[in-house]
Amino acid sequence: MSMPFYVSPEQIMKDKADYARKGIARGRSAVVLQYEGGILFVADNVSRTLHKISELYDRVAFAAVGRYNEFENLRLAGVRFADMHGYTYDRSDVTGQMLANAYAQTLGAVFTESSKPWEVEIVVAEVGDSPDSDQIYRITFDGSVVDERDFLAMGGSAERVTAALRERYVKNMSLTDALRVAVHGLAHENGERRELKASSLEVAMLERSRPHRKFRRIQGERLARMLQEAREAEEAAEAQSSEDGGATD
């Protein structure tokens, strides 16, 4: 009688984690960052209908990378959960932290109990009355939750994008400057700079000053105009940097 093949729990969890990370890395990146007027979401996404960025509730939004059918199921579950909670209690009781905890429990259970983990990484963000009260939570494939500040990148080559963001990000930027920094980060995803057009970007924001529902998409002519302004500001900054370098020499 042959003995059953033994695999340690540690090895099983490691294999699951490696599998999920590889699946997430195959997708394109997304960026979330705070700016003066709220929270900006920018995703490298050529589809006009399969969204990576969506509204969850009045002040709360969702961004995701990885396998679309899996994070779309999470999004729909989050919307239903938020609607039910807001209807049963009060709309102000629906918070980003509450939704992040619910997602963490779901992903943690799938990772532990299922033979195949979900290949997703998500962000739940809630805009506050001031930048200090904004909340940004990253939830990974195993249910881990990280409270983020300022900016984050996920999916694709997230480390490269994060490094590019760190070079340019400053607190309390304008919306145009925040978009410029986000596009700069995504443009360096593969280690080489590439030009990103409005047709290949999905952009949305949680706008602090907007009444009631804070979520708004930026698309069409407005996005093209903002990208052009950001591109001109980027070129001006590079020209100024070259002049400063020449003066130093």
UniProtKB/Swiss-Prot annotation:
Origin superkingdom: Bacteria
Any single Gene Ontology cellular-component annotation: cytoplasm
GO BP term, pick one: proteasomal protein catabolic process
InterPro entries recorded: Ntn_hydrolases_N, Proteasome_alpha, Proteasome_alpha-type, Proteasome_asu_bac, Proteasome_sua/b
Gene3D superfamilies to which the protein is assigned, alphabetical: Glutamine Phosphoribosylpyrophosphate, subunit 1, domain 1
GO molecular function per UniProt: threonine-type endopeptidase activity
A Pfam family the protein falls into: Proteasome
CDD domains, sorted: proteasome_protease_HslV
UniProt entry keywords in alphabetical sequence: Cytoplasm, Proteasome
Regulation: The formation of the proteasomal ATPase ARC-20S proteasome complex, likely via the docking of the C-termini of ARC into the intersubunit pockets in the alpha-rings, may trigger opening of the gate for substrate entry. Interconversion between the open-gate and close-gate conformations leads to a dynamic regulation of the 20S proteasome proteolysis activity.
Subcellular location per the Swiss-Prot or TrEMBL entry: Cytoplasm
Disordered: region residues: 229-249
Pathway: Protein degradation; proteasomal Pup-dependent pathway
Subunit structure: The 20S proteasome core is composed of 14 alpha and 14 beta subunits that assemble into four stacked heptameric rings, resulting in a barrel-shaped structure. The two inner rings, each composed of seven catalytic beta subunits, are sandwiched by two outer rings, each composed of seven alpha subunits. The catalytic chamber with the active sites is on the inside of the barrel. Has a gated structure, the ends of the cylinder being occluded by the N-termini of the alpha-subunits. Is capped by the proteasome-associated ATPase, ARC.
Function of the protein: Component of the proteasome core, a large protease complex with broad specificity involved in protein degradation.
Family: Belongs to the peptidase T1A family.
Name of the protein described by the UniProt record: Proteasome subunit alpha
Primary gene name: prcA
